[in-house]
């Protein structure tokens, strides 16, 4: 239906999925390391600097899972992220892509739940999409795994979406990737004790530009009256 994916997305079967990019050497190495961890039935913590191409790895892994006849859950922390990701994934996965979050209408959420029962699918959603009637999940991706938006304290049920996603993947005999530039302490500890495998991306994707960082001394600007309210003129 129209809201599964962007309007420009076309109908697509799992055998017709075509990537619109190629992996760099660094990404290919990381891809192979991830597969080695999967062979050992270990979830993966993918730590990559901003602009290193983690999303491309997610997409390549999702394509492989769908091609093998299994389904994919791709978690994002906030609804605000969904539109950009929807456009990106929709171009590749077409009508296999299902969107699920609290801003969708109840009727639309029911449609997605029914589509999940039928499969095949890749669900892009916030933490509530964990509770869809998933079957045969081959891959669960938790993007920005450190984000506190994955935790629900109120109302009940109270849960951590990241940790619940790991359990969900295990129940289905699927693989799991937690991805971030700034890992949570829990995930780093799990890597340290061998519960997870850490894979790193330290290079920018195909020479993406480095971010310029400048430290501004606002106390000095205040003394010089170089402030506009709470912001320096440079900001």
Mark where each language-model region is:
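Pre-Walker A segment
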Residues: 1-76
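Conserved interdomain linker/interface between the two RecA-like ATPase lobes of SF2 helicase motors
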Residues: 28, 162-235
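Short acidic loop-to-helix transition motifs that present clustered carboxylates
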Residues: 50, 81, 103-109, 183-184
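Post-Walker A helix-loop "phosphate-sensing" segment adjacent to the P-loop in P-loop NTPases
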Residues: 65-72, 94-96, 196-199
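Short beta-strand-centered segment that lines the nucleotide-binding/catalytic pocket of NTP-utilizing
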Residues: 70-83, 102, 201-203
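Conserved motor-coupling elements within RecA-like helicase/translocase cores
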Residues: 87-123, 131-137
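Flexible beta-alpha connector loops of hexameric P-loop NTPases
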Residues: 98-106, 147-159, 221-228
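SF2 helicase catalytic motif II
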Residues: 128-177
């Amino acid at each position: 239906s129209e809201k599964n994916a962007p309007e420009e997305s076309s109908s697509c079967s799992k055998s017709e999925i075509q990537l619109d990019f190629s992996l760099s050497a660094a990404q290919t190495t990381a891809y192979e390391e991830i597969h080695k961890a999967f062979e050992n039935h270990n979830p993966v913590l993918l730590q990559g600097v901003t602009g290193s191409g983690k999303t491309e790895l997610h997409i390549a892994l999702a394509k492989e899972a769908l091609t093998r006849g299994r389904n994919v859950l791709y978690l994002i922390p906030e609804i605000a992220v969904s539109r950009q990701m929807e456009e990106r994934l929709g171009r590749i996965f077409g009508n296999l892509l299902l969107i699920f979050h609290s801003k969708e209408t109840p009727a639309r959420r029911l449609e997605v739940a029914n589509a999940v029962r039928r499969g095949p699918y890749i669900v892009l959603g916030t933490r509530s999409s964990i509770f869809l009637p998933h079957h045969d999940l081959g891959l669960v991706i938790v993007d920005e795994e450190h984000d506190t938006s994955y935790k629900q304290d109120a109302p009940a049920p109270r849960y951590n979406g990241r940790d619940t996603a790991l359990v969900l993947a295990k129940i289905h005999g699927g693989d799991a990737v937690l991805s971030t530039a700034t890992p949570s302490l829990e995930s780093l500890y799990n890597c340290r004790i061998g519960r997870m495998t850490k894979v790193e991306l330290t290079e920018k994707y195909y020479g993406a530009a480095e971010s310029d960082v400048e430290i501004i001394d606002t106390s000095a600007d205040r003394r010089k009256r170089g402030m506009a309210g709470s912001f320096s003129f440079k900001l």
